[in-house]
């Protein structure tokens, strides 16, 4: 018999936290090193940089659409742990192929195709891992400790992002791009071993024989807070990709104008994004207290407003090497911490235990759609309008969700907004 939530041991929770960090190190390092690899190894020119980088991201996200939906359901059927282990191993295969793409593919077009394939493989692997880690955190929690456990998981994910940009993105300047890319394979293998050794499944198995789209749709249709959570996923998940991809692109391709080396530019961008990760990480405990005191919806509202303000302010930055850029980045960071935690807690609150994987799978599918839309449009805006344009675009999206969250807060204040969420205070 599988252990219940009360029987989950401390070392199993700690393993979940560590794996959350390792998974984000892998995913973030892959995205962060991509512009540097395409520019300096595959020699992709500035004129097409935005489109090429965005297309790579979109291809992987299209794959994730199918992975999230099916594997979320499959995890409800067979458990999360074996999917996590397999995902790490698949990701390791893609991570080995990626730096070898110039030699495997030969000519520049062939090398780019091989790199696309390697990114698809890595995305398939990581797409099998991190949603199941989030679901497992939900499995381990109950109403009394959910905000704490999911916040701790989010804290470790933010720590992984911070580690990449503050430390690991300094490696290309010393050991080279290839060594840095191969590091991702080692991280994946370590993750597979840790998951197999220490994680445990605790959720009840579903009796559904196919992906329960109808059941998920009925849940979302009936619960306004789930609608807000899903809408937040559409916009908020793309925000972190925006910062990781387009800010790095901006620094690397602006470097020639200010006579700064490419590796140095990548390191400067990495330190800035590392600062963002540090702010996200350090503010998550504050958001946890805010959520427990004021509620999930209020956290989404405030987080989206802060992010929107920061993104729009980035539109007024001309030179990314200017110190002014730090202020909007700090606003985005603080906002994203709230947007990262609160919608997931809302989703876990309202998902049946035997369908949690499926509901989170649908939640993540919506996030993929947001990334595909915003990154694709962002790449076009980067190339044809300018580097700040993608940030303004996504800032407007954040404002739209802020307006929806505010409307829901007001409707609940009038007593017509849906049932109470565990841990939420009543809005007087």
UniProtKB/Swiss-Prot annotation:
The effect of disrupting this gene, in the record's words, is: Slight decrease in magnetic response, has about 30% fewer magnetosomes which are about 40% smaller than wild-type. Double mamH-mamZ deletion cells have a poor magnetic response and very few wild-type crystals; most cells have flake-like crystals. Deletion of approximately 80 kb of DNA, including this operon, leads to cells that are non-magnetic, lack internal membrane systems, grow poorly, have reduced mobility and take-up and accumulate iron poorly.
Q: Which domain of life is it from?
A: Bacteria
User: In the UniProt record, does the keyword Ribonucleoprotein occur?
Assistant: no
Which parts pass through the membrane? Answer: 18-38, 54-74, 83-103, 104-124, 149-169, 175-195, 240-260, 271-291, 299-321, 326-348, 355-375, 377-397
Q: Name the UniProt key words of this record, in alphabetical order.
A: Biomineralization, Ion transport, Iron, Iron transport, Magnetosome, Membrane, Transmembrane, Transmembrane helix, Transport
Induction data: The first gene in the probable 17 gene mamAB operon.
Matching PROSITE patterns, A to Z?
A: MFS
- Cellular component GO terms, alphabetically? magnetosome membrane
The protein's job, in short, is: Required for correct biomineralization of the magnetosome; probably transports some form of iron. Partially functionally redundant with MamZ.
Q: By what name is this protein known? A: Magnetosome protein MamH
Gene symbol? mamH
């Amino acid at each position: 018999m599988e252990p219940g939530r009360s029987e989950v041991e401390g070392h199993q929770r700690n393993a979940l936290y560590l794996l959350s960090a390792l998974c984000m190190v892998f995913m973030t390092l892959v995205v962060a090193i991509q512009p540097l690899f395409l520019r300096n190894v595959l020699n992709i020119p500035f004129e097409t940089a935005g489109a090429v980088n965005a297309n790579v991201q979109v291809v992987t996200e299209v794959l994730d659409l199918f992975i999230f939906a099916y594997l979320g359901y499959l995890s409800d059927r067979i458990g999360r742990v074996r999917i996590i282990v397999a995902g790490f191993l698949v990701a390791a295969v893609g991570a080995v192929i990626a730096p070898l793409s110039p030699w495997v593919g030969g000519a520049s077009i062939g090398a780019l195709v091989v790199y696309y394939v390697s990114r698809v493989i890595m995305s398939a692997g990581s797409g099998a891992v991190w949603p199941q880690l989030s679901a497992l955190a939900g499995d381990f929690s109950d109403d009394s400790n959910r905000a704490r456990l999911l916040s701790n998981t989010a804290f470790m994910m933010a720590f992984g992002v911070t580690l990449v940009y503050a430390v690991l993105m300094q490696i290309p300047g010393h050991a080279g791009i290839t060594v840095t890319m191969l590091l991702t394979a080692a991280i994946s293998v370590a993750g597979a071993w840790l998951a197999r050794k220490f994680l445990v499944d605790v959720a009840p198995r579903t009796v559904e024989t196919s992906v329960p789209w109808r059941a998920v749709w009925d849940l979302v249709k009936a619960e306004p807070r789930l609608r807000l959570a899903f809408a937040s996923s559409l916009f908020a998940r793309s925000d972190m990709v925006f910062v990781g991809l387009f800010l790095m692109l901006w620094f690397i391709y602006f470097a020639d104008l200010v006579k700064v080396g490419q590796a140095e530019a990548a390191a400067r961008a990495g330190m800035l994004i590392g600062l963002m990760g540090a702010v996200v990480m350090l503010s998550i405990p504050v958001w946890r207290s805010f959520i427990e005191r004021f509620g999930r919806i209020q956290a989404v509202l405030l987080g989206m407003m802060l992010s929107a303000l920061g993104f729009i302010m980035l539109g007024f930055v001309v030179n990314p090497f200017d110190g002014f850029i730090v202020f909007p980045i700090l606003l985005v960071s603080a906002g994203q911490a709230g947007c990262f935690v609160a919608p997931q807690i809302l989703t876990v609150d309202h998902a049946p235990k035997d369908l949690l994987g499926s509901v989170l799978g649908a939640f993540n599918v919506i996030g993929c759609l947001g990334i595909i839309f915003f990154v694709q449009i962002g790449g076009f805006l980067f190339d044809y309008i300018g580097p700040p344009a993608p940030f303004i675009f996504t800032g407007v999206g954040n404002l739209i969700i802020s307006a929806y969250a505010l409307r829901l807060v007001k409707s609940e204040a009038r007593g017509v907004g849906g049932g109470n969420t565990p841990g939420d205070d009543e809005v007087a």
